[in-house]
């Protein structure tokens, strides 16, 4: 486990989570989740959905004292299938748990992050390393980000910035839809500055990006309270890391 930016993270491959086991879905999914899982036509969609729930509930039961006493199938994680800016909601016995959760996956692995710190929301994103064309870069990156990318091609890729933007949006949004260019990541030697719809988030937003084999992982946390966290050094980090499932 790595504790980073006021949150706990878990990473695992689908193989490690044994999502193909006949009993896994029944053991880990609530009735509502099981109904939704059975409606998915794609095997990949079923496997990634199940993997995300398994890993998220492992993290939740380790962090939240109420959830620790519950069976995994008693916990329901509700999210918006259209990805239109609705955070996952965690329900137990009809009550919503006070916990900020974020789930992201590729076809092969899943990353989850969570925190029970009051006033802190977070977002995680997991992206496969691959070449992305000029059209994608134009639609996702601002001119400043593209210029930085050209100057730092050995250390940074479009996939890194993609993952960071997704993570920031998940942490910061208030229900609006995702617009990639509304999030601007300014990476400088003295630290990272994040703008959201032109607003400088300053020290309220903490951001980290690193590599996990052939994937890019990013986590962002956002302080929503009036009181700001203590000053910190928000330096960019692109490095390998190991997270336990």
Each model region followed by its residue ranges:
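Core catalytic alpha/beta fold that binds nucleotide/phospho-ligands
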Residues: 1-245
């Amino acid at each position: 486990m790595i504790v980073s930016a006021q949150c706990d993270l878990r990473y695992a491959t689908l193989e490690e989570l044994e999502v193909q086991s006949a009993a896994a879905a029944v053991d880990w999914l609530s009735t509502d989740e099981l109904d939704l899982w059975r409606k998915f036509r794609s095997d990949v969609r079923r496997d990634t959905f199940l993997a995300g729930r398994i890993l998220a509930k492992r993290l939740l039961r380790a962090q939240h004292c109420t959830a620790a006493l519950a069976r995994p199938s008693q916990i329901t994680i509700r999210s918006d299938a259209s990805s239109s800016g609705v955070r996952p909601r965690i329900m137990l016995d009809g009550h919503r748990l006070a916990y900020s959760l974020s789930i992201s996956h590729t076809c092969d692995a899943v990353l989850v992050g969570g925190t029970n710190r009051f006033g802190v929301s977070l977002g995680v994103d997991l992206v496969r390393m691959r070449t992305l064309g000029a059209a994608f870069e134009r639609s996702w990156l601002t001119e400043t980000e593209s210029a930085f990318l050209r100057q730092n091609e050995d250390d940074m890729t479009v996939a890194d910035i993609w993952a960071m933007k997704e993570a920031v949006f998940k942490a910061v949004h208030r229900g609006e839809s995702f617009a990639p260019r509304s999030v601007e990541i300014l990476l400088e030697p003295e630290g990272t500055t994040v703008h959201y719809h032109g607003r400088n988030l300053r020290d309220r937003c903490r951001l980290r990006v690193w590599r996990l084999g052939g994937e890019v992982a990013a986590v962002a946390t956002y302080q929503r309270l009036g009181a700001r966290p203590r000053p910190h050094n928000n330096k960019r980090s692109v490095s390998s890391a190991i997270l336990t499932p």
